[in-house]
UniProtKB/Swiss-Prot annotation:
Disulphide bonds in the chain: 26-29
Its biological purpose: The disulfide bond functions as an electron carrier in the glutathione-dependent synthesis of deoxyribonucleotides by the enzyme ribonucleotide reductase. In addition, it is also involved in reducing some disulfides in a coupled system with glutathione reductase. Thioltransferase catalyzes cellular thiol-disulfide transhydrogenation reactions. It transfers reducing equivalents to cytosolic protein and nonprotein disulfides.
Name by which UniProt lists this protein: Glutaredoxin-2
Domain Glutaredoxin residue range list: 6-106
Family of this protein: Belongs to the glutaredoxin family.
Keywords: Disulfide bond, Electron transport, Redox-active center, Transport
InterPro entries linked: GLR_AS, Glutaredoxin, Glutaredoxin_euk/vir, Glutaredoxin_subgr, Thioredoxin-like_sf
GO biological process: cell redox homeostasis; cellular response to oxidative stress; removal of superoxide radicals
Pfam families reported in the protein's UniProt record: Glutaredoxin
Source organism phylogeny: Eukaryota, Fungi, Dikarya, Ascomycota, Taphrinomycotina
Amino acid sequence: MTSIAKAFVEKAISNNPVTVFSKSFCPFCKAAKNTLTKYSAPYKAYELDKIENGSDIQAYLHEKTKQSTVPSIFFRNQFIGGNSDLNKLRSSGTLTKMIAELKENKSSIL
């Protein structure tokens, strides 16, 4: 893990309302991004298999979140988990509320 990876992750989750660290070939990542798109969530995805230092970024995410798999999803600066966690939020109705809150406060987080 490098300080470059840490800086990249921290900047990404600070600058985006919703951040998804993903891999382009991962079906769980695709499902999570599809869910966020369906709910019109203002998200930014980073494909770790396509960017420089992707493995270092994933190592830092593991250190930060204790989750070794992708997707790693953040709402504002809060880690919410992976695709199964996103589906739990969707099923409970919480996801809709979280996205509405993000959109209402968009100017303060963008």
